[in-house]
């Protein structure tokens, strides 16, 4: 039986995945730089996204991006991991994800959830056990000092509504970093158009 991709991760899996992954750390997100005041963050709740660079997305969004971001603790689905490129991976991701990215010729840049004790850069992607790749991408955009983030296809509705508590943390951290967040649909943030952004 296949797992629901938005299932909670257990504390045991967090420990197991992070212990395996930390042995394979090469580069971290501190080895990346995006010198842009604006970053577009895309999710799979929409099929069409504006052409803009830099653009961050989860692999499941199935678009070309400057940075693919995932916190997924399930084995990699072959239909989602099809592109080489730069990937920001949470320490809690399933260890087979990094293997798949290397097979594709991609580059991996690691980060850690805020609640694990280690020397990796910390990114908030939600609350313990309920983390979301879209929220991680928003946090990363703010981490890279974007002054303005535009969301496309990130809604956190339906089965994803359980990530709304984590959204509060991510948005609070972005505000502390003086990052403004806008949305094309107005679901999670102030609505704007791509041209007005």
Q: Each PLM stretch: what is its role?
A:
Residues 1-197:
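Metal-ion/cofactor- or nucleotide/acyl-coenzyme-handling active-site neighborhoods
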